[in-house]
Regions:
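Surface-exposed beta-strand edges and their flanking turn/coil or helix-capping segments
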Residues: 55, 158-161, 194-196
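Weak global preference for isoleucine
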Residues: 9-10, 29, 46, 62, ...
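Compact soluble domain cores
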Residues: 1-115, 197-199, 204
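Conserved small/polar residues in nucleotide/adenosyl-binding loops
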Residues: 206-211
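Catalytic "initiation/cleavage/transfer" segments centered on a nucleophilic residue
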Residues: 181-202
């Protein structure tokens, strides 16, 4: 992959990231093999985009927020960055476009299984071909993205729980009202959500009736 090709990818992904994910939170509702229900909230900011690209910045004056704006405005140049020596930049470029969706194209979620020695992340959401990793932000409970990965999520997590629904909200909103993914063949009447998210049952039913 050339730098020109990589620039083309980040230039096309930056507007999608801003439109679909920046200043938004996603809430994943999952079920494990015992049918227990779990929830994970993740939050996105423009400063997370640099981690997703694997670009190594050459100029000290470019921080993560500036980097995103340069990509968004198509002003980043080949002289501004290098590829990571271990090949991860090219890998991230291959999967980044498929992850810039409202729901990350994610069907499964799990705890990272430490299978890649140099990779640090906590939670992974994804599919059979592309995944996104999340870490706690400053230990305050908020999960933020810190990497993207190529390949089958089932090889990267301890147990791949099924995502049955994904909700999205903007930063200023108190509650989730937009549903951006629902799995097929979910017995919603049997799903018991944690108290803080029990209001989502009506959101789910409204969505299902509309579809």
């Amino acid at each position: 992959m050339t730098k020109k090709e990589a620039l083309s990818i980040v230039f096309s992904c930056a507007p999608l990231y801003k439109e679909n994910l920046v200043d938004k939170s996603l809430l994943f509702i999952t079920t494990d093999k015992h049918k227990s229900v779990h929830c994970l909230e993740v939050t996105f900011d423009i400063s997370n985009f640099l981690h997703m690209t694997g670009f190594k910045l050459c100029k000290p004056g470019i921080n993560a927020r500036h980097f995103f704006n340069l990509c968004y405005d198509k002003r980043l140049t080949e002289a501004d960055f290098e590829f990571s020596a271990d090949g991860t930049t090219e890998m991230k470029m291959r999967v980044l476009p498929s992850l810039m969706k409202k729901n990350l194209s994610a069907k499964m979620l799990g705890d990272y299984n430490m299978s890649q020695p140099k990779l640090y992340t906590d939670k992974i959401a994804g599919s059979l071909s592309a995944c996104m990793g999340f870490v706690r932000d400053g230990g305050e409970g908020r999960f933020v993205p810190n990497t993207v990965l190529e390949g089958d999520i089932r090889t990267k997590v301890k147990a791949a729980d099924r995502i049955i629904a994904t909700y999205r909200k903007s930063r200023g909103e108190e509650q989730y009202s937009e549903i951006v993914f629902t799995a097929k063949k979910v017995e919603w009447e049997k799903i018991v959500l944690p108290d803080e998210y029990c209001y989502l049952v009506s959101v789910s039913y409204t969505h299902l009736r509309a579809h």
